[in-house]
């Protein structure tokens, strides 16, 4: 865990915002910013509006959001969260996510995505919703690679175990395989590891617009990967090959995101 985090507490004006995320009508972001400090994160663009320093060094906490959403019946799918992780380490103390789940009208159609096994804490509340799906972002970053680009996130082993536990407890789950990067992600391996206990899958290829810092990192440390992503023709060929591979698998695919 990144202990050097600046916490900024604010009062939110409204609990949800409209979104263009496919399949969702609204997003809820009880936190903005992230302790995981992933080098490839697309949400770094939030630094334009929240100028508190380097991405990964601060988190905005909307401390009144559970009260704003209390007993509200929101029609349309809600995605939690688009510029944050609902189960980052400080959630253990603030419990915003848990209190939102307690307060929101349980008829809400909710989709949660996280990288943390802390999500298992709230299984009792998940079971009260009429429509809920809970996803874990899975990749096979490990060793020095994970230390470099996902320094403070839970291990993939913990995420996969959490995915399995959700499934065993009757909670609809999904694996969000991301970011898919040439030579660094083994999509077939991840599917093989998770298929027996995963209801459906999303796949996301690396967002090249997300971080110049990350592209530079790949260029310096993984030149073969960089050579592919920096060449439009080569990257498209790689994407097509991966898509063809996953479509041959006997799995439910809800979405494939190519930026």
From Swiss-Prot:
PROSITE patterns: RADICAL_SAM
Keywords: 4Fe-4S, Iron, Iron-sulfur, Metal-binding, S-adenosyl-L-methionine
A Pfam cross-reference name: Radical_SAM
Co-factor remark: Binds 1 [4Fe-4S] cluster. The cluster is coordinated with 3 cysteines and an exchangeable S-adenosyl-L-methionine.
One GO molecular-function entry: catalytic activity
Keyword Metal-binding included in the entry's annotation: yes
Record keyword Nucleotidyltransferase present: no
Binding site for [4Fe-4S] cluster: 34, 38, 41
Cofactor: [4Fe-4S] cluster
Boundaries of every Radical SAM core domain copy: 19-249
Coiled-coil ranges (or none): none
Name the record gives this protein: Uncharacterized protein MJ0683
Source species of the chain: Methanocaldococcus jannaschii (strain ATCC 43067 / DSM 2661 / JAL-1 / JCM 10045 / NBRC 100440)
